[in-house]
Amino acid sequence: MSVFNKLMRAGEGKILRKLHRIADQVSSIEEDFVNLSDAELRALTDEYKERYADGESLDDLLPEAFATVREAAKRVLGQRHYDVQMMGGVALHLGYVAEMKTGEGKTLVGTLPAYLNALSGKGVHLITVNDYLAERDSELMGRVHKFLGLSVGCIVANMTPAQRREQYGCDITYGTNNEFGFDYLRDNMAWSKDELVQRGHNFAVVDEVDSILVDEARTPLIISGPADQPPSGTADFAKLVTRLTKGEAGNQLKGIEETGDYEVDEKKRTVAIHEAGVAKVEDWLGIDNLYESVNTPLVGYLNNAIKAKELFKKDKDYVVIDGEVMIVDEHTGRILAGRRYNEGMHQAIEAKEGVDIKDENQTLATITLQQNFFRLYDKLSGMTGTAMTEAAEFHQIYKLGVVPIPTNRPMVRADQSDLIYRTEVAKFAAVVDDIAEKHEKGQPILVGTTSVEKSEYLSQQLSKRGVQHEVLNAKQHDREATIVAQAGRKGAVTVATNMAGRGTDIKLGGNPDDLAEAELRQRGLDPVENVEEWAAALPAALETAEQAVKAEFEEVKDLGGLYVLGTERHESRRIDNQLRGRSGRQGDPGESRFYLSLGDDLMRLFKAQMVERVMSMANVPDDVPIENKMVTRAIASAQSQVEQQNFETRKNVLKYDEVLNRQREVIYGERRRVLEGEDLQEQIRHFMDDTIDDYIRQETAEGFAEEWDLDRLWGAFKQLYPVKVTVDELEEAAGDLAGVTAEFIAESVKNDIHEQYEERENTLGSDIMRELEPRWVLSVLDRKWREHLYEMDYLQEGIGLRAMAQKDPLVEYQREGFDMFNAMMEGIKEESVGYLFNLEVQVEQQVEEVPVQDGAERPSLEKEGATAAPQIRAKGLEAPQRPDRLHFSAPTVDGEGGVVEGDFANDEATGDTRSGSADGMTRADAARRRKGGGGRRRKK
């Protein structure tokens, strides 16, 4: 344990004593609530709300509120919160991460802080990893809250904005991390206040907090629209790389020459093309220099094609179903339908597999969900079965302390030491022998594998031995809950990819609810089609199932409980602990063991040679395992290396995103003020003054008044607004040209532009002007922000090369990002003023109001003939349009690795806005280009 971790744990005892004290306080008043009627219990909610409004704090209300929820849960669910669950609830309310072992009832714990914090009326968000858990928890735990008079909502995919607004309006809202994050982004792309769905970020309880805040922290949420051009060279390069051969890196100091056309580093998941490979590619493509700037996109195609060939394996990283490449979550083995890798990687895999290649997308809005979205909450807490291994990270990045909550009953699971074999074949043979032996006596077994491929290989070996079993992987994900629920039955053998079924308890003897449902379905009943018959038959079926489960539970308990067998160590100790944690819930007996081989990914990438030497020295045959402390230490060392590597990556992502986050706060704050109806008159006057100052500064920064090109300056003014004051008038007022100073020009032109603004308002009318101003500002702001994200993307992609010039890439990114942001702000001011004066506006009379479409978003500034708002027509600034496709990119559910994408439902699409100018460049853009900032790069 590191010194930092020891320091972190030093205060644990003090916190636990505090939690114990409060839990005892709740138990001491429990009897006062038992004799209350349902109506009296429900009335307490209003009483607590009044007391909170009168100045009592939530901490003051905590003991009574928790006792109220405990009694309500007893009456509604038949479940009473244990004292340790009370401790967990207090930890969550105080803003800690509560580590609670599997089966300790984390879902029930969430009801306590949710109820207490909902009393403030500001809303509580309970965040889970998938829609299934969000719906299940909101329905089941929602009964307790509804019984106590609180409203409960649930956010799931494909809801309309109106439905989402209603769910967010509830006292307590359940949903997934991605849904909450995307709603925040879409709120900041909204075109009117009516489209906003979220009402603030008060308090969040994150379930499986390690998965959401750690595993997925490297992956940002991205909303994107179609790119201007689809990738054209992907298919050609997929064919081309089949003619290239993999080799090894050279070392000039050791006199080792590089071999092959390219090298692959599996540990870092990178590829590098050798000189020989470059020469071949140049020859085949008929080009002189692959690395010329004009050929930059080709390098990207080539690297992606090699990665697709070497690093992305079919039936492990992805599967091909019905001509479509589908990503497989590396942790759960689930298919992530509709999701796509970004940066052209998915297209490269599609080209490799010979299926249709779909277009790439362009970023419209982005945020790192974990590191910046969750920091929006006034108070954040979380719960998981495995958090202590990442306690330092929770503290350093999120300022969250971790508290290990004691188990309700002592843990009696036996964790056996690892067995290591020389080859994978020998390992799996031993695994099959072990399973067959345990299966013969009837002990339930859960086998964890790391990929679809390995789960199917093991399944074949078990079938050859005649062992009946269930396979749970990406290809059987639709039966997941049923298989997992019955994995604790006598004689059950379940082969699962990693952590599939997280959130579903494996109960010894089986799950009576699922047994009863299966029995009724066998009789031909359906809960949707035969509602009345189902309701009538359910109680009897449930009673029969409960009796059967009770008898089987005792049998399975005597056999030793659930045996968890891991076929490979994961790169994170936490994932291994999660697999082990499936067994030994609530004091049940259980056993776990990991089988390893030198061919396993972790062993191959780290320390395998040392272990091989140990086994060779000991002269160990292939089929004989070793249990060696040195090997166990080597595995622990390899895991900590990977964990540290991943931690550094996450910290690095945060540093870079922090730059963008500050810019995002400025832009989103500005948008929110516009949407909420702030009077823009004063702001637009500032825009005018700043733009005039900028124009004059660019023209008069050098030389004397006689050398200034005032005709060119006035030409720019005329493009901006209908300028009335002339150069001759200024000369006359100043006496001669020498008296015309920059300050004098600025004062005269500002007075003139303000007069023209008032004249424009008199022509159109104040009401119409007030309605058009937010449209002008929002349309320009959105397009400029989108272009800025685009450029920041490319800046970050190439910034690492600055290290070769002895410069800190992060400092360079901050400096250049700041310059780009300032240029964008200047462009926003300039274009907003230009729209104000140059847009043609027609007012149609006898129309009372402008209807706002539900789900309508930003305007299109180019498509004429689009459906116009009935009251005001502004040429080039028409009613909001929806593009055909709008995409999202998010972290994999339950996973750590992939960046994945999919389509939003059309009614949630957000319109695209484009420049109304001929070349799309403002003077601010042009000035930046002259300074060497370059134009906007087009993403290929």
Swiss-Prot record:
CDD domains: DEXDc_SecA, SF2_C_secA. It catalyses: ATP + H2O + cellular proteinSide 1 = ADP + phosphate + cellular proteinSide 2. Residues 851-940 are annotated as: Disordered. One of its GO terms (molecular function) is ATP binding. It is a peripheral membrane protein. Does not complement E.coli temperature-sensitive secA mutants. This is Protein translocase subunit SecA. It comes from Streptomyces griseus.
